[in-house]
Amino acid sequence: MHCPFCGAHDTKVIDSRLVAEGDQVRRRRECLACGERFTTFETAELVMPRLIKQDGSRQPFDEDKLRAGMQRALEKRPVSVERLEAAIGHIKHQLRATGEREIKSRVLGELVMAELQKLDEVAYIRFASVYRRFQDLNEFREEIERLAREPAKE
């Protein structure tokens, strides 16, 4: 680590602590050349897998697009921003946990539907109707009946 005061290359770590709920390491360092102390923060760089679309094209994971799609389904529904953000965090965690560099977009769609089902059943039906391309009222009815038969997921 370079000293921000004198530019020397040699520093020593005086103290290390976990911060940000264990997602970050805070280190107090001392420059061996000038004796100045400074603080650094370390976080893991977590790369999201790329998505393989149905047509075979590939695109990077876009958290904003995920959020917009979920917000559209949740429009005018009684779900807090905090619960939405927690669901997005859970989806991202599951994607990273696959350990894959690329995943089919279908996997992401299924994760979104599972989270929406836990958040709000109306939002789930809205999303599923677009995602699964419901063609008529019977497809809506079948999905609603299937949802009514399943035990609530939390």
Curated annotation (Swiss-Prot):
Comment on bound cofactor: Binds 1 zinc ion.
Cofactor: Zn(2+)
Family matches, as InterPro entries: ATP-cone_dom, NrdR-like_N, RNR_NrdR-like
Zinc finger region(s), unnamed: 3-34
Domain named ATP-cone: residues: 49-139
GO biological process: negative regulation of DNA-templated transcription
Keywords associated with the record: ATP-binding, DNA-binding, Metal-binding, Nucleotide-binding, Repressor, Transcription, Transcription regulation, Zinc, Zinc-finger
Chloroplast among keywords: no
GO molecular function: ATP binding; double-stranded DNA binding; zinc ion binding
Cross-referenced Pfam families: ATP-cone, Zn_ribbon_NrdR
Function summary: Negatively regulates transcription of bacterial ribonucleotide reductase nrd genes and operons by binding to NrdR-boxes.
Family recorded in the similarity comment: Belongs to the NrdR family.
Protein name: Transcriptional repressor NrdR
Naturally occurring in which organism (per UniProt): Pseudomonas aeruginosa (strain ATCC 15692 / DSM 22644 / CIP 104116 / JCM 14847 / LMG 12228 / 1C / PRS 101 / PAO1)
Record gene name: nrdR
